[in-house]
A protein has these predicted regions:
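Short glycine-dipeptide loop
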Residues: 331, 367-373
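Nucleic-acid modification enzymes, centered on SAM-dependent nucleic-acid methyltransferases
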Residues: 1-299, 318-345, 352, 359, ...
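A short glycine-rich, Lys/Arg-flanked "PGG" loop and its adjoining helix->strand segment in the class I
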Residues: 353-369
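Hydrophobic beta-strand segment of the Class I
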Residues: 306-307
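Local beta-strand N-terminus motif with an aromatic residue
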Residues: 302-303
Length: 420
């Protein structure tokens, strides 16, 4: 039922060859740099023209002692070696408190896409990483940077743009999601504008090329284009290490990062080019359904083999995570049919078991007699394992083989099921 997953599968199977894809990406990136490159122009420490690689933003905090504002980056972190401090000494009153006792500063701004005033966390750009003539550099944000960013913040949204509401569930946190109700609020104004214009730019290409370029954008989007991009501190590192969004959640750190989207696209395109190359010599027909597996379209006894990787109970709310990409497609996953345990959707373990049973029953129906299904599953809770076991046994399938394979420290259990 996943809209993003179905779109990705359909697009990779659209018979575009690797050379066509590479030519399209090269042309797309060239056009994007010509039309949007000015959004990331900056100057190095000597005043020479350069390009932004990324900018660290910092939450502004409120001192619990004197109620004055201070920068988390300036007062709660250190460089060379990098560390996040457990305490902060207020630069105004000199009092020291645990970092967690400093509340975030808030600001009222007019959201011109929503056409109303909103309250959000106050964040400020603090450190710029750039490149000039192939040489990388970094420096503190200066007044010229602040003027440019303020100007971008005050720009109107595109006339054709519309608000796209976030449907919150288990992942919403009152702290770091404060003021985020719509898609555009997950981005800096600059990166949302660039992403919107890039999306519009894809519409100049034929359908199969357009969708390939859109998939490229979406593969980079939630991990690297939003405020969920972050920096981390590694032991004895001289500077912060840039990393993408934390997987499986919609976490925004106290030090979100604004990355230059244009720089990442060409690098991100390489695995897609390789995938198209691998598929060039494939024969046969591939049919992709964006529908629930509780009611399959395949005929009874028509399938030789099934592979499935069902949601692991309450482990990850996939539809909630994927909406950051799916909202760009103007179509999101139907959560009513999502097989997970979810208090926000009022789905219990019993509901999960019942829906999973229906899927396994359908697998049993479409499989040929004495043919197999492989299932990958993991759960850390006994009640979820019990639900999974009952779903299999009640479906007409039987377990004929199991194996355990560790993945990132978690046991993954592939099961071989046979239709009997």
């Amino acid at each position: 039922i996943g809209v993003y997953g179905s779109f990705a599968a359909k697009t990779l199977a659209n018979r575009l060859n690797a050379k066509e894809f590479r030519c399209a990406v090269d042309n797309f990136v060239q056009q994007a740099e010509m039309e949007l490159g000015q959004y990331y122009k900056t100057k190095d420490v000597k005043g020479n023209e350069g390009v932004v690689r990324h900018i660290i933003l910092s939450e502004v905090l409120i001192c619990p002692e004197c109620d004055k504002e201070l920068s988390y980056f300036e007062n709660g972190t250190k460089r060379n070696p990098v560390q996040f401090t457990k305490t902060i000494t207020c630069p105004h009153c000199g009092k020291t408190h645990d970092t967690d006792t400093f509340k975030p500063a808030l600001e009222n701004i007019y959201d011109s896409l929503l056409k109303k005033e909103i309250v959000r966390k106050k964040r400020e750009p603090v450190w710029v990483y750039g490149t000039t003539n192939g040489k990388n550099w970094d420096r503190k944000v200066n007044d010229e940077d602040r003027v440019l960013i303020k100007m971008l913040e005050e720009q109107e949204f595109e006339e054709s743009d519309i608000p796209r509401e976030i449907c919150w569930g288990e992942l919403h946190r009152t702290g770091y999601h404060l003021g985020i109700t719509h898609l555009h609020q997950f981005y800096t104004k600059r990166n949302y504008t660039v992403m919107f214009k890039l999306w519009k730019l894809t519409e100049r290409y034929p359908n199969n090329v357009r969708e390939a370029l859109q998939l490229l954008l979406l593969s980079y989007n939630s991990t690297h284009c939003t405020l969920m991009t972050r920096v981390v501190a590694k032991r004895n590192a001289k500077d912060f290490v840039l990393t993408g969004a934390q997987s499986g959640v919609l976490y925004i750190s106290k030090l979100p990062v604004e990355k230059n989207i244009l720089l990442g696209l060409k690098r991100k395109s390489i695995p897609f080019e390789e995938a198209y190359g691998l598929l060039e010599k494939c024969t046969g027909e591939l049919i992709i359904h964006n529908s629930s597996s509780e009611k399959m379209l395949e005929k009874t006894g028509s399938i030789d083999f099934v592979f499935t990787d069902p949601p692991f109970g309450d482990f990850i709310p996939y539809a909630e995570v994927n909406q950051i990409n799916e909202l760009w497609l103007n179509h999101t996953t139907d959560r009513e049919k999502e097989i997970i345990i979810s208090p926000s959707q009022e789905k219990s373990v019993a509901d999960y078991q019942w829906m999973l049973t229906r899927v396994f029953t359908e697998i049993s129906r479409v499989l040929k007699p004495d043919h197999y299904a492989a299932v990958v599953f993991h759960a850390a809770k006994a009640k979820i394992w019990e639900a999974f076991e009952h779903a299999i046994l009640d479906s007409g399938l039987a377990v004929c083989m199991t194996s355990i394979q560790g993945m990132r420290g978690l046991p993954i259990i592939p099961l071989s099921l046979i239709h009997i």
